Structures are given as structure tokens and as C-alpha cells.
Amino acid sequence: MPAALGLLLPWLSLVGALQPGLEPPQSDPTEAGAVFFASEYNSTAEIVLFRSVSASWEYNTNLTTANAALQVEASLEEQNFTELWGKKAKELYGNIWSNFSDPQLKKIIGSIQTLGPSNLPLDKRQQYNTILSDMDKIYSTAKVCLDNGTCWDLEPDISDIMATSRSYKKLLYAWEGWHNAAGNPLRAKYQEFVTLSNEAYQMDGFEDTGSYWRSWYDSTTFEDDLEHLYNQLEPLYLNLHAFVRRKLYDRYGPKYINLKGPIPAHLLGNMWAQQWNNIYDLMVPYPDKPNLDVTNTMVNQGWNATHMFRVSEEFFTSLGLLEMPPEFWEKSMLEKPADGREVVCHASAWDFYNRKDFRIKQCTTVTMEQLFTVHHEMGHVQYYLQYKDQPVSFRGGANPGFHEAIGDVLSLSVSTPSHLQKIGLLSSAVEDEESNINYLLKMALEKIAFLPFGYLIDQWRWNVFSGRTPPSRYNYDWWYLRTKYQGICAPVSRNESNFDPGAKYHIPGNTPYIRYFVSFILQFQFHKALCQAANHTGPLHTCDIYMSKEAGAKLREVLKAGSSKSWQEILFNLTGTDKMDAGALLEYFSPVTTWLQEQNNKTNEVLGWPEFDWRPPIPEGYPEGIDKIVDEAQAKEFLSEYNSTAEVVWNAYTEASWEYNTNITDHNKEVMLEKNLAMSKHTIEYGMRARQFDPSDFQDETVTRILNKLSVLERAALPEDELKEYNTLLSDMETTYSVAKVCRENNTCHPLDPDLTDILATSRDYNELLFAWKGWRDASGAKIKDKYKRYVELSNKAAVLNGYTDNGAYWRSLYETPTFEEDLERLYLQLQPLYLNLHAYVRRALYNKYGAEHISLKGPIPAHLLGNMWAQSWSNIFDLVMPFPDATKVDATPAMKQQGWTPKMMFEESDRFFTSLGLIPMPQEFWDKSMIEKPADGREVVCHASAWDFYNRKDFRIKQCTVVNMDDLITVHHEMGHVQYFLQYMDQPISFRDGANPGFHEAIGDVMALSVSTPKHLHSINLLDQVTENEESDINYLMSIALDKIAFLPFGYLMDQWRWKVFDGRIKEDEYNQQWWNLRLKYQGLCPPVPRSEDDFDPGAKFHIPANVPYIRYFVSFVIQFQFHQALCKAAGHTGPLHTCDIYQSKEAGKLLGDAMKLGFSKPWPEAMQLITGQPNMSAEALMSYFEPLMTWLVKKNTENGEVLGWPEYSWTPYAVTEFHAATDTADFLGMSVGTKQATAGAWVLLALALVFLITSIFLGVKLFSSRRKAFKSSSEMELK
């Protein structure tokens, strides 16, 4: 109890004594004396009760310690009055009152003798009153608070959340918070209260408090009658429960709703799941019919609390009943006070026992539900007004259920569409069958849903009072009854540290509850009788007794009697029966009962909850995210808006980017950056809005997938100034790369394409190759090193702002595979033996060409000798490594040049390939707007081949500085593969216009190239004179493909190994280049041809590094393209070795591929993989199968030549490796100029790695050779170059 209240109690015990003039009189112990005694009691009781009720009103409308003390004082005075008058009545009439001839007098004297808490000694009485006051305050001041300090009151905050939120998490937070805040602190106090209350009523001759409460109903069969009524109503409830459970299943899914189990208690629109009408919107039978919830109309019409009470008053007066007295309007609390007072918001009607002061206390909000509550409370006051001239002892309902029923009877009329139309809240009252079902279901959600709750609360309390439910089982028994009768369960685990009954007002408020169950039966009996008096014809649910004086007269007779007659007699006078009966209720709901049974039969619903013990899981991340939007329809509207606006914004940026990439000028760069900023603003605006949704329980996976994708803002998450800096860095790095040139002493300058690329591809002059290789790295990579460091910082910051540990973690997340890195490593190890054999064979050929001075047969290969600037593809040195020079060589370049092929002819040929498969031809915009040759007008352009989607579903282009050769013909097919993918998924939402994973996009074109590059296909398009099918030709062909595909694999793997380590900090800024060459040595077996240092930045000499393009996609694509190829060849009916397959003109293969491409990013990539290959995993099996003949040949050849697999002389370089400079304390290590201590440490590390590497390589090579015909299986994801 409050400390201040404790100090006041000794004083209160004195002031609680009755004032002079209020004591019982001396009167004769006769029936005549009893008449005088009863008269004196009545006038005195009015004084005492007025004081007690006034004190209680003051406390309930201003919860302060002082008011609590005054309430306790007034309660003590009332109890002293009850005690003194009761004991006097017992003394004078205890032996004779039952023999009185006047039945009214008999009832009055009998009730005066029931003392209740007044039986208790003063100290216990004080304790009893204080417990009730404390419990009242705990309940009324309970709040649910958030981490940010915001707190919710029950009214209106929590009630609104329970009524309107559809967020599983938010509802759970409100439900759990309220039960913990309001219920748990009451547990010990309630146990004390039960002990004291039982003690008090046992002194009046009752077994316990429950027995006393039941005595008001004056029926020896009361409990049996209730059970009989409940059994009558149960089938209707079970059908309603099953229907509602199915609708909640549709909304929340199988995770949270079990169609054979109880319903989680927080999902039914009300804190106690006692009425379900607030979730009517989730289960409207006929949504196209007029909405019966007139809340919005009330708000729009400017209704306020006072007007709602005036409308209710007018209903009563229209029946010829009494209007509210002036005191009602002057003294009622009809709204929650705005002055900060703590009040008891629970709606209640008050009789001050002076026959003129009647009030309502309600924190009214303008809603339809509250309009009914207003009528309910006004019904109580009308009852008070009608029986105010009865003796105090008879100022009550005929039984407690009568009082509750009166206002609700009025609500049955008020809620009809015809009445709502009469008072201007509905434009029309359509009464067709569908509208009737809508109306009746809404009423059932209020009335029928309530019945088991109304029944069980006092079942629980009667068991508590009787001791059948001991304190150790308070909460267990509560939830047992709630599941047994209501078919609901707690949404979180509850135990005996909780006290969930206390979270319902009537428990701490000590208000018996069975009255509400009784009233829900009686109100329909009353309604039927009053409708008959009003001459209503038609179904009972359409009756409105508004303005019927006849109905009013019948009602008045019930009200005026108060409790002066038995309720059975009053009920009989109104209805013609003296028993409670569910017949009228069942008649009222008859149409919807039939409809519910039909609906449940259609969906084969289980009635009841046989899986009694089922409980829902706790939501992931709970209680985080409770304020997020969970309305799926709202999410769909948002995504529709996003899609249409994104198409415009993305198109504008892509156009500007195209202009810049095809004409590198400062102006075009500025425009591109401006459009990029606009796109970033759009991304961040919609990304932040997307983050406001919690899609975890959405039923449409597409909506969830897009929202999750949108929520990742990428670079747009950066502050605007840093975003501008980031974009400028990327633009500057890409520009530096694109305009870089290598100049000779005679001032002749060479761009990368086509000059340097041609030198690397065709020259066999060691020094000329070295000039191009070193010159390119000096001109490109070295110049962007400092910018790259800042780029890494900003990239990581953006990743962290998106919820990732670093940028590498974000890049890997695009593959939606937790084991992605492990899967890649497993794939690489499967493929490594093939690479090692190819490396050893090529190294021998280069040794034969360049000699021991430049090549070590046990060391790495100098990186500039492999025909490509980055040694990623070795196909340009095929002439040096050709296994059988006299056999047919597959090279279409001479024929292309001889036949006068042009870049456009190359693209047209590629288009023919795709259309031969039944795929989509290139649209006209493609031919009109693509840049397929390097412009001859001197413009600086980005030559790196790329395919472009302009996001308007019609404009797709390729930018390529095409050269007429076979290599570029393959590249053309690759880029056209991207465009075909664009065309296939162009009707997907913009968020899904992407590959199933980044590797898929890269693989599609290359799959075509695997067919295009076959001798059979080249012959069919007249680029090869003949197709020679023998082992030597096959090995030549497979070698040409392996120099492109297999040689690429370690490079495709290591590029992002390096970047991921840069992003996560494992590679520091001062070792960028050293670690780059460590990886190139480890995986590719390459070394730099000249010394390198940290002044160089060789990673930056590769386009994808300055351009910020992730690279692992290419490794992924090189694996999965063979899986695709194998599956498409099977669909095309190919027989024979996989490397001879050409799917040209196979519509079956085309359909398989097209169906997968149409998905875009709309499904996780394994589903697209399943569509094409029939299984969901990445695997190297198809690749190994494709190259099996070559692998067999390489192993044999290398064995014959005594080749060493790997590069055990890892520190060998083609220049002096032991050049020391004592003055600078540096050494040359792996081509790097580093400190001597670093070099020593590095040497030991690499020695250990080399030994492991050598042993592993030999083991894998032997293992593969001995079991090469076995399948290679793995799982993962992949891409291209």
C-alpha cells in the first residue's frame, strides 16, 4: 500500500465511525417495528451511500493517494453503517423476519442482515479496503512502455492497437506488456483478498464469496442452468471459431495459426479476446456490400462524446422513457481528462442514491463500438432513473444480468442498418441476403464470441473462492479454462509468476462477471418481446424498436420494479416465460449459423481444437520491429508506386550513363553524376519506406522478397556528401582506366583496346609484351591507388549502414547461400587438378618458346606471356600450345575476315542463334541505338563490352568495340545472352529484373557460345570448311576451349578473394599489391615479369576493380554454364560427348532456358537451377565431364614429359631475385620490394604453403586420374569474366 495511506489508517479507523444521527434506531422487535426500521434504514443509507459513492467517484476520476485515503474512509463508514444496522437487524428481527407477512419487507430486512466485509474486524476491514484500492490503482495506472520511453495506457492506446493493428509482433508486445504490467503485481494482493472476502461472507452463512454471488440469482439450479445454456450455444460458437481461425490463417499463415489448434489470444481485436468485432475487416463475408462500420462517418460528421450521449438519450426518450437529469450532463466524465489526471477509464454508470445525481464515467472515443458502449451505460442510468423511488434495498436489477442487458437491448436496435440510416450514419439500408450475412457476422463477432469468456471468468473465480483452484494453480487453471471454452491460447509462455486473470478489470475491481453471460441471453429474450410489442414483422435481427412507445411501456415496467420482485416474475411479465432461454438468441443468429456451417464444410474445417496443447512460436527478432507496417495490401500499393517511379528514374540515369560511356566528356560526367544522385535519392526514399514494413508474416512471398531487396540501400545509405564523394571516386577511377594509354619514346600512344590487347594477343616478342604489360599497369592501376583506399572506406560504411559487416559480406549476400564461401572452395578444389595439368602443359610450351632464361619448369609463369593482359584467358597463345598442329584447328577468324564479316553481321548471326531456339529477337531499338564498334569520330569511349537494360521494357543495347575475330564473336554471344535475359524478364517488377544470381546472367550468353564454338556449328554458318571428327581434332578443340574456360577459373576465384579480404581488413592498405601477387601466385601459378612494390597497384589495372563490379559471378558462371549446357543438350536430344553438342535450332532447349530466364530474380536461384537442370545445386560434374577427354590426354602427356604439377620453386622470377640494397634495408620478394624481415617471414610462410600445396596437388592429380570417370558433385552458385 502507498506509504502515505499507511500513515492515515489509524486516523481512518476513528473517522470511519458513524456520525451521530446515522446509527440504527431503537424499534420494536415486531413486523410493525421492522417497517419503521426499514424506513429509517432507507433515509440513512441514502446519506451514507451518497458519501461513499462520491468518494469513490473522486478517486476514480483522480487517482491520488489523498483521494485513495478518502475513498477508504468512506468505505469504512459505509461498512460501519452496514455492520451496525445489520447487527441491529439481526438482534431485533433475526428470529422473526422470515415469518413477516409483507414479502417486500421480508426481502429488505433479509438484505440488511447480509454484512459481507462489514463482518470483518476493523483491522481486517481496513486491510480489505486497502487491497481493493491498491488493486484498482495498479490496474488503472498500468502502462506498457517501449525502449524509447514512450508509454501506452490501456485506454485509448493499447485498446486501439489491439483493435486496429495487424502486426503479430506489435499485438504480442501490447498483449504481453499489459498482462505483465496489470496482472503480475496483483497476484499476492489477490490471494489476500480471496482469504478476507471468504472470511467475511462465511460469517453471513455462505460457503464462500462465490456462493454469496450466486445467491443473487435466487435459483437452486443456477449453475446447472448456465451449463445447459452454454451447451445450447456451443455449436454456434464452434462454427464461428473455425471460420475466424481460417481467416486468421489466411492472414498470418501456418506459422502462427494451427487449423486444428487454439487461436493465439492476441489476434482477435481485443485484449481479452472477449469480442472479435474489431477484426471484422479480415473476414467480411461480402466485401463489396456496404461497410457496416460507421466510425469514419461519425468522425467525418464531427461527432464528439457529448453528441454520442445525446443520440443515446434521444433513443430512450423516443420510447417514452426518461431523459437525463441536469446533474448527469454537469457532473459526468464523458471523456478522458486532458489535464493529466490519472483516471479509471473503464466505462461505468453511477447511482449516487439521492434520486437526482446519476453519472457516467467513460473515456469515450468516437467509434461505432463506443457508440454501443454509450447505449449500454445509458441503459444502466435509465434503470437507475426508473427505480429511483424504490427503497435503497431494491435499487438494483431484478438480477445482476438484467442491469447489463438493458443497454444492450437498445444496442440491438441501434446497430441495425435501418437505424444507422435513420440517424444519418448510413446512406442506405440494403437488406438483401448478403448484407444480412455481413451484419449478422459482425454481431456474432461481438455477441457469440463473448459467450465462453462471459461464462468462464466466474467459473475460475468460483473455483478460486471454493479452494478448488489453489494459489499455486491460479494461472494454469485460468489458461486451462480459456482454452477449454474459448479455444484460445497464450501467445507467449505463461507460468505461476504471472497473474493473467488480473489483467481484466473485473478481477481487481471485484465485479462479478456471470451477469454478462446472463445478460447476453436475456437481452435477446427482451429484444424479441419488445419487437413483438413494437409490431415488428420480419427476421428478428432486422428489428428496430426506436420510437415505439408500446415497447417503451413494456420496458418501463421491467425497470421500475428494480429488484422488488423476483427476476423470474419480471421476466415472465415481459416474455411469457420465467426461465432464461437461448431460443431467441439462436433465432436471431439463425441465418448466419447456416451460412457458417456451409462455409466451414467447403473448407473442411475441424470444429474445436483437438490439438489442445499447440502453442505458436515467438516471432523472430521479437520484440524488435513492433512499430513496422504489417498491412500487406498497403505494401503492394507501395511496391506498385515504387515500380512505376523507379522505371522513370532508372531510365534517366541509364540514358545519362550511356551518354557518358559512349562519349567521355566532363559535361557528360556531370550529367551522369547528377542523374546518379537522383537515382540514389529515389533509392534511399523508397528503401527507407520499405524498411517501415515488417514482411516477415506476409503471405505473398513476392512482396516479402521485393521489400527485403529494397531495404538494402547500397551506396544510397551514405550521407549525401559522402555519396557524392563515392560517386565521384568511382567515376574518376573508371575514367582513369578508360582513357589510360601507354606511350612509346616516339610519342606513339596505345589505348588498351584494340592496341595493347592486340599486342598481348599476337606478339611473341618477350620485351614487346613486357612493354605493354608494365606500361598498362603504370598508366592505369598505379594512378588510382589512393582513390581506391577511400573507396574501400566508403563502401564498407555503406555496407554497415545496410546491416552488413563489410562490403564483401554484402556482395556475398546476393547469392542467398549461408555456405557460399565453403561451396566455392569445394568447387575450386574439384577443378584444381584440371587447372594444374593445363598449367604444367602450357608452361612446357612457353619454355620451348622462350627458353630457360624466361621460364622455370618448376616455377610460376611470367604473367605477360599468356596472351591476355591479366592472363585470365590463354586462348590467344593456342598457336604455341596446339596439341596436334597438323590436325584441324578451330579458328573462325580467317574465314570471317575473308568473307568480309562486319561487327553488325556478328550481332545478326548471334540474333539468329537465339531466335532459332524460339527465343525473342532483338527489338528495333537495339539495332538503332547500340554501339557495336569503336566510334571513328575520335570520341573517348568505355570499350569494355557491356549489355544495357534501359528499364522501359523496350530499349536494350550493347556497347562493344567489336573487332572481327572469333574471340569477339564469342563475346557478342555473351553480351546478347544478357540482352536475351533482359527481354525474357522485362515484365517482372523492376526489382526482379536481374539474374537469379549474378552468375546466371553471365552464364546465359556463354552457354550459347559453347554451341557456337563447336566445329559443327561453325561449319553450319560457313565459318569452317569441314568438320573433322577424330581424337586429335577433338583434343585441339577442347584445348582451345580450356585455354579460355579452365585457365580462367583461378583468376575468377581470386579476384574477390582479394577484395573480400581488403573489405574485411585482413589485407591492409600497405600490402594491397603484395597480397594481390600472393594470391595470383597461389591460385594461378603466375609471377610478375618485373619487380613490383606498394607504389604499384596492379589490381587496379583490371576493369572490374575501379568499376566496382563484383567478380566471383564469373567463376560461378563458368561452373554453371556447363550444368546448363549439359541440361540443354539433353533437352535437344544430343547424343555423344558433351563438347560436340550444338543446341542450335532446338526449340525444346530454348523453352527450358526461356522459362528459367523469365523468373529473373523473383525466386531464389536454386529454383531457376532446378528448372533447367532438374536439381538445385552448383556442381562441377558437367564441366569435368565436358573436359574429360582433354584431362585424360593432359595427364598422359605431362607424365610422359615428367612435368611437375604446381610451382614448388614459387620464388622464382624471370629477373634477378637476390638484389639487396643494404642502405635501404629492403629486399625483392615475389616481385615485391619489401623490408628484409617481411621478406624472410613471407618466405617461410610461402615455403610451408608450397609444401602443403604440392602434396595436395599431387594427391588430387593422382586421385582424379585414377577415378576420372566418376561423377564430380557439389553445391553452390556461379558466373563469368
From Swiss-Prot:
GO molecular function: carboxypeptidase activity; chloride ion binding; metallodipeptidase activity; metalloendopeptidase activity; metallopeptidase activity; peptidyl-dipeptidase activity; zinc ion binding
Upper classification of the organism: Eukaryota, Metazoa, Chordata, Craniata, Vertebrata
Protein name: Angiotensin-converting enzyme
Role, per record: Dipeptidyl carboxypeptidase that removes dipeptides from the C-terminus of a variety of circulating hormones, such as angiotensin I, bradykinin or enkephalins, thereby playing a key role in the regulation of blood pressure, electrolyte homeostasis or synaptic plasticity. Composed of two similar catalytic domains, each possessing a functional active site, with different selectivity for substrates.
The protein's enzyme class: hydrolase
Cofactor: Zn(2+); chloride
GO biological process: angiotensin maturation; bradykinin catabolic process; cell population proliferation; hormone catabolic process; hormone metabolic process; kidney development; positive regulation of systemic arterial blood pressure; primitive erythrocyte differentiation
Residues carrying sugar: N42, N62, N80, N99, N148, N304, N495, N535, N573, N601, N643, N663, N746, N1177
Amino-acid positions noted as binding chloride 3 in the UniProt annotation, renumbered to this chain: Y815, R1113
Residue positions binding chloride 1: Y217, R515
S-S bridge residues: C145-C151, C345-C363, C531-C543, C743-C749, C943-C961, C1129-C1141
Membrane topology, Extracellular segments: 18-1241
SUPFAM superfamilies xrefs: Metalloproteases ('zincins'), catalytic domain
Predominant subcellular localization, coarse grouping: membrane
Membrane topology term: Single-pass type I membrane protein
Family according to the record: Belongs to the peptidase M2 family.
Annotated source species: Gallus gallus (Chicken)
